[in-house]
A protein has these predicted regions:
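Conserved N-terminal subdomain of the carbohydrate kinase-like
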Residues: 50-100
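Glycine-rich phosphate/adenosyl-contacting loop at the front of the ribokinase-like
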Residues: 1-58, 67
Length: 100
């Protein structure tokens, strides 16, 4: 049994991209892009596992994004339990302006 179990009620796929500059009304020319598993409990379990302790992340997952979330968590080698849901797992988007 795991010593730490996290429960994430609203997990997400965290999408991060970088742009040279953000200008009102202008298209963003994105460079690179990264997708990571996200949500409070998922992140806590990832850190605990990286520090060498035993943890398992429990979270709902649905739709295409839910399947991707499960793949991303598995890619890191972490233990997890995905609870199937009818809805779609959310995706959030962060833009880093390199110029600032």
């Amino acid at each position: 049994m795991s010593s730490i179990v996290t429960l994430t009620m609203n997990p997400a796929i965290d999408v991060s991209i970088a742009v040279d500059r953000i200008a009102s009304g202008a298209k963003l020319r994105c460079q690179g892009g990264e997708r990571d598993p996200g949500g409070g409990g998922v992140n806590v379990a990832r850190v605990v596992q990286r520090l060498g302790a035993d943890a398992v992340a429990v979270y709902p997952a649905g739709g295409v994004m839910g399947a991707l979330l499960q793949q991303l968590v598995a890619r890191e080698g972490g233990r997890s339990v995905a609870v199937p849901i009818a809805g779609e797992t959310r995706e959030d988007f962060t833009v880093l302006e390199k110029h600032s």
